[in-house]
Design a protein with these regions (language model features):
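Short, internal strand/loop/helix patches
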Residues: 106-147
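Short, thiol/selenol-centered motifs that function as redox-active sites or metal-ligating centers
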Residues: 62-72, 95-96, 135, 192-195
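Short active-site neighborhood of thiol/selenol oxidoreductases, capturing the structured segment around
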Residues: 50-69, 173
Length: 198
């Protein structure tokens, strides 16, 4: 996919992605059942079981979402920064995006993060994700500690700040790595809605 988007595609795929929920905390949820996506070779992968005791960060993206594409440099930067202590995965929840399209997208935007397809939305449900881009952070025990926006760069789909003033994903990773008993936190994301399975 290129960086240009046809207007009809924009109207179809990009909706005002601010969720109505506000910031809240509840008990962190644990990962019990096997939840898998598929790597680009079609092999099932459970990113939490593959972590070997590290924190896990899932970033939900899609190839044709301009908001998530704008975040690509920051997502890669955070992955590089935390590489020794956290596993990052790009998760593509749109079942229409095949492996070759995803490979092309990752090359175009400079991603070096492993990618997973999530056509059955197993990881979407596990992470409670609704938007791309949206991040989910799991601590080393597999508990979901955070899901929501990466930062507050976008006010809504039509407005963005010159620079972010809060950095929720970075803060959530630091908290997950602290080893403290965490509660689940969330912050509304702005972007493209994840479509329901047809």
């Amino acid at each position: 996919m290129g960086r240009r988007f046809h207007s009809f595609r924009w109207r179809k795929l990009i909706l005002p992605g601010i969720l109505t929920a506000s910031l809240f905390s509840v008990s962190a949820t644990s990962h019990n059942a096997q939840e898998t996506g598929f790597d680009l070779a079609g092999k099932p992968v459970d990113p939490l079981k593959a972590a070997n005791g590290k924190a896990v960060v899932l970033i939900f993206v899609r190839t044709d979402c301009p908001v998530s594409n704008r975040y690509a440099p920051l997502i890669q930067k955070l992955s590089d920064e935390y590489a020794r202590r956290a596993d990052f995965w790009l998760v593509y929840p749109d079942k229409k995006e095949d492996a070759e399209v995803i490979r092309q997208h990752d090359r175009e935007y400079g991603y070096k993060i492993p990618a997973l397809r999530d056509p059955q939305h197993a990881l979407v449900k596990l992470s409670q994700a609704q938007i791309t881009p949206e991040a989910a952070v799991f601590d080393a025990s597999g508990r979901l500690a955070y899901h929501g926006r990466i930062d507050d760069l976008y006010v809504d789909m039509a407005r963005s700040r010159r620079a972010a003033t809060t950095h929720e994903l970075d803060d959530a990773i630091k908290a997950a790595l602290s080893g403290k008993n965490l509660t689940l936190a969330t912050k509304p994301a702005v972007g493209c809605y994840i479509s329901d399975l047809e």
